[in-house]
Regions:
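N-terminal accessory regions of nucleic-acid-interacting proteins
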Residues: 1-36, 40
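Conserved acidic
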Residues: 28-31, 46, 57, 61-111, ...
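N-terminal G-site helix/loop of the GST-like fold
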Residues: 33, 49-51
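Ser/Thr-glycine-rich phosphate-binding loops at phosphate-binding pockets of nucleotides
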Residues: 39-47
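Conserved Walker A/P-loop ATP-binding site and its immediately adjacent core
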Residues: 114-116
C-alpha cells in the first residue's frame, strides 16, 4: 500500500472509452475504465461524564452508553486504482486527492457499504446528492465539488459482507487484525499488519467489480442493486416481444387508489408460533419440513392475474371452483369472527381501523365482533378453513382472469433452478461462477415482482445533516402510472405485473396451510379435517417450513406439485424434466417438493422469528431475528434458558450484533493522543445485545405453558390459549 503524496497529478489515466448518450445523438461522453475503490477505517469513542474521551469497555450497560455523547473519526482512508492501493490519514487529504483525478470524464468509485463512508464524507463534500430508498442508505452519491465523480455502493450490488464476497471470489479478507475498540486517530502510528488489513478491503472490491465486468463489459452498465442484475436479464427476455410490451402495460394499475389497494393486499410469508405450544419446552422427537425453492415453484406452477382488475357489483363470495382461472380481490366484513384452529391467520395490521378485535395472538386475530379486511381469493381459502363467523358481507369485489406467466420467464426460472441444483458442489471455475450467479438470480426473482412502482423521495438536508421522507401524493402516483402505461415503445420500465408478486406469496401461504390443514382447501370449511391434518401437532411455521411433532408423510402434497407442473409444462410445451434436475450425485430434486430436513429432539418457541431446537446431533440451534447463530453458546447447552426476558449479553464473545449510531452534531474534541477533531458527522458503532421479551397480551395468552397438565382442567388451559374445541 502506497502513501498518497500527489501521485495522481502526473498519473497517466489513459484507460477510457467514449460513447454517445443517445443512440442517434451527438453528445459523446468519456468514461474512465480503471476500477476505482474507496474504503475507510474509523474509531468509535464516547465523551464520559467527566468530559474525557473514552473507548468502549465491556461491563457497562446499554443505558450507560446511551447517556454519553458518541464520537467517531476516520483515521485512515484507502483508494484503489485497480490493484494498487493508496492511502492517507485525514479526510482533507482525501478531498485533495479527488481534486487530482481527471475532471474531463465520468469516474465511478466503488465503496462497500457506502452508507458508512457517506456519513464521514458529509464533513468535506458540498452539494451532496444521493439516490436512496431509505434514510442513511445511499446507493450512489455525487457532489458539486467533483461533478464527474460518482460513488456507488457495492454492498447493494452483492448483499454480501466483504468477507463472504472475498470468499466467493477466492480472495481472503483478513480478519482479526484490528482491535476495533482501540481509539485511533489520524496521528496514531499503524503497524504493517494493520495497514495490510486496510489494503485488503479495496482489493476484494477490485476483484469483485472485475468479475462483474465479465458480464457487463463496462462499469456504468453494472446495475445498482442485486435485484437490478436479474431485472435486466428478465426485461431483455420479455420486452424484445413488442406484443408483450403492449400487453404488460394494460396491467399497470388504473390509478393511485388501485395501486394502494394492491399494496394493502400484499402480504409476505406466514411466520408464526402455534399458541398451543408456544413457551413450552417440547422434549419429543419431531420433524422439520421445508419447501424446495417455494417461490420459484409458485411462479412456475400457478396461474396469475392476466387482465386488468375490473370491479364487479356482485355481493356474494365467488364460487371456489373458479379460483384456478379467475383472481378475485374482496373487501369483506365479518361479524362474530372466531379462530377455531391452533394457528391464527388474519393479521391485525391488515384489518380496517374500524374493526373491533377483542382478542389477538401475537399480531394475528383470534376473535372480533366486527372485522373488515381486503384479501385475495387465496386468503379466503385459508380463512374459511380456520375461522367461524356469524356473517360475512362482500363490500367490494374485483376480478382478473388468470393465465400462466410468460413462457420465457418460466423457462428462465427453470434454467436458474437447474443450474443451482446440478452445479452445487462442483469445483471447476465455470461451474462455481454459474452456480453462484444462478443462486443470486433465483433468489432475486420474487423481489423483482414486488418492487414498489414508485419510491418516496429521501431528502438529505446538508445544513442540519438530517434525513426526511417526502411522502408520495396521489397526483404524483397517478402521473407516474400514466407514464408507465405509455404505449411508446421506449417506455419499458414496467415489464412484470405488481399483482404477480402479490399472488406468489398468497399461493405460498396456501401451500403451507395445505400441508398444515391436510387438504387443498377447496370446498372445505373449518369443520372439515382429514387424515393429513397437522394443525394440532405443528409447533412453528416460517414462510416455507414447518416444525411438527411425530412422523409425517407429505407424498400427497408432492404429487399435487407434480400435477401442477405437468399442467404448466403441457400448456407452455416445456420439457417436464426441467422441473426435476439432478444433483451432482445424480439424484432428482423436484421443484416445490415438501422435504424433510434435520429432525429435532427438543424445541421451544417464544413467537415469530424466535425459536430454539436441539437436533439429533445433540447440538442446540437458535433462530432469532437480528442475532447471530453463535450466540447459542450463551444458553449453556440448556434449552430451558431460552425463555422470556433472557438477555443475549452484548459483551458475550459470540454475540456479534452491532448498533450503528448516526451522529450529526459531534462537538469539537481532543482525543487521548492529542489529536483535535472538529467534525460534525459520523457513525459510531458499539456492541448490541438482545432481550427476549414477550408482550403482555401474548404472555397472557400462553402463560399456562409452565402449568403441569394435572393442575388445571385441559379444557380450561386450552380456552385460555384461544382454543374452543
Amino acid at each position: 500500500m502506497v502513501l498518497y503524496n500527489g501521485q495522481f497529478k502526473s498519473y497517466d489515466f489513459n484507460n477510457y472509452h467514449k460513447k454517445r448518450q443517445h443512440r442517434k445523438g451527438k453528445n459523446v461522453k468519456k468514461y474512465y475504465d480503471d476500477i476505482f475503490t474507496f474504503d475507510i477505517e474509523t474509531t468509535s469513542a464516547w465523551v464520559n461524564e467527566h468530559g474525557n474521551v473514552i473507548k468502549y469497555k465491556r461491563g457497562k450497560s446499554s443505558e450507560y452508553w446511551n447517556s454519553l455523547q458518541p464520537l467517531s473519526i476516520c483515521y485512515i482512508w484507502m483508494f484503489g486504482v485497480n490493484d494498487v492501493v493508496y492511502y492517507g490519514r485525514t479526510l482533507e487529504s482525501f478531498y485533495e486527492m479527488l481534486g487530482d483525478l481527471p475532471q474531463d470524464g465520468k469516474i465511478i468509485i466503488w465503496v462497500h457499504n457506502l452508507s458508512w463512508e457517506a456519513h464521514f464524507l458529509f464533513n468535506i463534500l458540498t452539494g451532496v446528492k444521493m439516490f436512496c430508498r431509505t434514510p442513511h442508505k445511499p446507493m450512489k452519491l455525487t457532489c458539486d465539488d467533483f461533478p464527474n465523480i460518482e460513488l456507488r455502493c457495492s454492498y447493494m450490488l452483492t448483499r454480501l459482507s466483504l468477507a463472504n464476497w472475498g470468499k466467493s471470489l477466492g480472495v481472503k479478507k483478513l480478519t482479526g487484525d484490528l482491535e476495533y475498540n482501540k481509539i485511533r486517530t489520524p496521528i496514531t502510528p499503524l503497524t504493517e499488519k494493520e495497514l495490510g488489513y486496510c489494503e485488503r478491503d479495496c482489493i476484494v472490491v477490485y476483484e469483485g467489480i472485475k468479475n462483474y465486468l465479465k458480464q457487463y463489459g463496462r462499469q456504468e452498465e453494472i446495475p445498482l442493486t442485486q435485484t437490478g442484475t436479474v431485472r435486466r436479464v428478465v426485461k431483455e427476455k420479455l420486452m424484445e416481444d413488442e406484443a408483450y410490451n403492449k400487453f404488460i402495460k394494460t396491467l399497470v394499475p388504473h390509478n393511485a387508489k388501485e395501486y394502494k389497494m394492491l399494496q394493502h393486499v400484499f402480504a409476505g410469508g406466514y411466520t408464526h408460533a402455534n399458541r398451543m405450544h408456544a413457551g413450552k419446552i417440547i422434549r419429543e422427537r419431531g420433524e422439520h419440513y421445508d419447501f424446495t425453492s417455494d417461490y420459484p415453484f409458485q411462479l412456475c406452477a400457478r396461474k396469475y392475474p392476466f387482465t386488468p382488475w375490473a370491479y364487479i357489483p356482485d355481493k356474494t363470495i365467488p364460487d371456489e371452483n373458479t379460483y384456478n382461472d379467475v383472481a378475485y380481490i374482496m373487501e369483506l366484513k365479518f361479524t362474530e369472527l372466531r379462530c377455531e384452529t391452533c394457528n391464527s391467520y388474519i393479521q391485525v395490521v391488515k384489518c380496517s381501523t374500524d374493526s373491533r378485535i377483542t382478542r389477538s395472538d401475537n399480531g394475528r386475530v383470534l376473535e372480533a365482533s366486527e372485522l373488515s379486511i381486503t384479501i385475495t381469493e387465496q386468503d379466503w381459502l385459508i380463512i374459511k378453513n380456520m375461522y367461524s363467523f356469524k356473517s360475512v358481507e362482500v363490500i367490494k369485489l374485483y376480478k382478473s382472469y388468470k393465465q400462466y406467466l410468460p413462457k420465457p420467464f418460466i423457462e428462465y426460472v427453470l434454467e436458474l433452478y437447474g443450474n443451482k441444483t446440478s452445479l452445487k458442489d462442483l469445483e471447476d471455475t465455470l461451474s462455481v461462477e454459474l452456480y453462484k450467479k444462478s443462486k443470486e438470480h433465483i433468489n432475486a426473482l420474487f423481489g423483482m415482482t414486488v418492487t414498489a412502482l414508485l419510491q418516496s423521495d429521501i431528502i438529505f438536508d446538508e445544513e442540519t445533516l438530517e434525513w426526511k421522507i417526502d411522502k408520495l401524493t396521489e397526483s404524483r402516483v397517478n402521473e407516474h402510472l400514466d407514464k408507465l402505461r405509455n404505449f411508446n415503445q421506449r417506455e419499458k420500465r414496467y415489464f412484470l405485473s405488481y399483482s404477480w408478486g402479490i399472488y406468489c406469496t398468497a399461493y405460498a401461504r396456501v401451500s403451507l396451510f395445505m400441508c398444515l390443514l391436510g387438504s387443498d382447501l377447496i370446498n372445505t370449511t373449518v369443520a372439515d379435517t382429514s387424515e393429513n391434518y397437522k394443525d394440532d401437532v405443528e409447533l412453528y411455521a416460517d414462510t416455507d417450513s414447518l416444525f411438527l411433532l411425530g412422523s409425517h408423510d407429505f407424498s400427497w402434497y408432492n404429487k399435487w406439485c407434480n400435477d401442477r407442473l405437468i399442467e404448466m409444462c403441457k400448456y407452455h410445451k416445456i420439457d417436464f424434466a426441467k422441473t426435476r434436475p439432478k444433483t451432482k450425485k445424480g439424484k432428482e430434486k423436484p421443484l416445490g417438493y415438501f422435504l424433510r430436513e434435520a429432525d429435532f429432539i427438543e424445541f421451544r418457541t417464544l413467537g415469530a422469528k424466535r425459536y430454539c431446537e436441539r437436533r439429533t446431533d445433540g447440538k442446540l440451534y437458535i433462530t432469532i431475528s437480528g442475532i447471530n447463530k453463535e450466540a447459542v453458546y450463551m444458553l449453556k447447552n440448556d434449552i430451558a434458558n431460552f425463555k422470556n426476558d433472557f438477555v443475549f449479553d452484548k459483551d458475550f464473545p459470540t454475540v456479534t450484533k452491532k448498533l450503528p449510531i448516526y451522529i450529526s452534531n459531534m462537538p469539537a474534541v481532543t482525543y487521548p493522543d492529542g489529536y483535535k477533531a472538529n467534525y460534525k458527522s459520523g457513525v459510531a458503532l458499539r456492541p448490541n445485545g438482545y432481550k427476549m421479551h414477550i408482550d403482555d397480551n401474548y404472555s397472557k395468552l400462553i402463560k399456562y405453558a409452565e402449568i403441569e397438565s394435572g393442575d388445571l382442567p385441559e379444557t380450561f388451559v386450552n380456552s385460555m390459549r384461544g382454543k374452543w374445541v
